[in-house]
């Protein structure tokens, strides 16, 4: 084996099994999606500075524990038909209502979205298939982050919207 210097992020994909044990599913030298959205919501520091110092080999490992006190939850809103053939072109409304739910504690990350240009010159935000949006909420406790996240999920509308209703539930059982 050759020794290779690794300077990047390492994503560990975990799955909690039926017995409550965390199992490693995969390793990737990239950020996980949508897991990163939840991490970024509670990151207490400058992500660019952290990544730069890792890349040039000056990362102070004592700064890695720079996650703010709190918890986060991210729920993916997918287009109808996901994970198979998905709908496209459905107008997305009320994102602002979701983001305004709790000042600074709810973020909406775009994935499968597109702008549709109307003949009258107006534009509308539409689905573009697959994972459409990642709704992320943070709070002091996991229970409150999950509650806030699903409240925001209910405020965003588009035809065929689908999402899991159990995100974070296993974490609550562990706590």
PLM-predicted stretches and their roles:
Residues 10, 23-25, 131:
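Protein kinase-like catalytic core scaffold
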Residues 1-5:
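Short, small-residue-biased leader/transition segments that mark boundaries at the very start
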């Amino acid at each position: 084996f050759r020794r290779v210097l690794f300077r990047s992020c390492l994503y560990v994909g975990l799955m909690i099994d039926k017995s409550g044990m965390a199992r490693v599913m995969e390793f990737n030298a990239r950020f996980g999606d949508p897991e990163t959205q939840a991490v970024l919501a509670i990151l207490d520091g400058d992500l660019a500075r952290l990544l730069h110092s890792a890349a040039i080999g000056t990362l102070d490992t004592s700064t890695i524990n720079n996650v703010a006190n709190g918890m986060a939850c991210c729920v993916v809103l997918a287009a109808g038909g996901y994970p198979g053939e998905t709908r496209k072109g459905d107008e997305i409304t009320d994102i602002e209502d979701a983001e305004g739910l709790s000042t600074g504690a709810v973020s909406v990350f775009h994935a499968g979205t597109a702008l549709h240009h109307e003949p009258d010159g107006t534009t509308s935000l539409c689905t573009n298939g697959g994972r459409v949006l990642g709704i992320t909420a943070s709070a002091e406790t996991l229970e409150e982050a999950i509650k806030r996240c699903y409240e925001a999920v209910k405020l965003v509308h588009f035809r065929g919207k689908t999402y899991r209703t159990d995100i974070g539930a296993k974490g609550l059982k562990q706590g």
